[in-house]
Amino acid sequence: MFDIGVNLTSPQFARDHDAVVARAFAAGLSGMLLTGTSLHESEQALALAQRHARCWSTAGVHPHDSSRWTRETEQRIRTLAQAPEVVAIGECGLDFNRNFSTPQAQEAAFSAQLALAAECGMPVFLHCRDAHERFMALLTPWLDKLPGAVLHCFTGTRDELQDCLRHGLYIGITGWVCDERRGLALRDMLPLIPANRLMVETDAPYLLPRDMTPKPGSRRNEPAYLAHIMARIAHWRGEDAQWLSGETDNNVRTLFGVAM
């Protein structure tokens, strides 16, 4: 049971990284991917991955930070990507929901990171919100040059899901699906995702599953809660959770080349 999306560089984890990681492995995780969302956080994620066994990281710039993308950023991400613990370029993509960076800056940074991933022969860890058409237009020409791609924290429509699957993307599902207010449509789509295209993630410390009982004392999500998300996903898909965990671990090995 591998968590492909842990924001361990978040200030919410600053005081207890080691305890969070220990709880995750005590809860049965086989490994976790620490997300880099800026140059600084990519450097931090790598340092944490080097500190903890069975942890790997990504290196990239989130669309929110795209306005900070420069040639120097690109070179430093390229250098980070040479570390054995870095197994994907990202988190990169487009987010037209809040536009913390302009769409033009987002597209430029996304395209540059796709080119960098192709140059390095690495998969991409992707973000898309309210931008599917433009996201796919930029991504599709690169897909045959990349070893693979996962769209992290999918929350799109049925048509968008089917489009992503047609293009061979892996789909990351978070505790969003456990939200009785926002997650019902995604819950209904779960059976559409082939088991060999599914990955699971907490996106911790965000997206604490709302249906956990008893509720955690803190609203902070943790990778230790991945077992709950996996069990709920398996239930709604009509599958055995242990079997599905094995399938998603195989997908992680295939895309990221990690040894768990």
UniProtKB/Swiss-Prot annotation:
Subcellular location: Cytoplasm
Record CDD domains: TatD_DNAse (cd01310)
Domain of life: Bacteria
GO cellular component, one term: cytoplasm
Sites where the protein binds a divalent metal cation: E91, H127, H152
Pfam family of the protein (one): TatD_DNase
A GO term for molecular function: magnesium ion binding
Primary residence: cytoplasm
UniProt EC number: 3.1.11.-, 3.1.13.-
This protein's UniProt keywords: Cytoplasm, Exonuclease, Hydrolase, Magnesium, Metal-binding, Nuclease
Assembly notes: Monomer.
Primary role: 3'-5' exonuclease that prefers single-stranded DNA and RNA. May play a role in the H(2)O(2)-induced DNA damage repair.
Protein name, per record: 3'-5' ssDNA/RNA exonuclease TatD
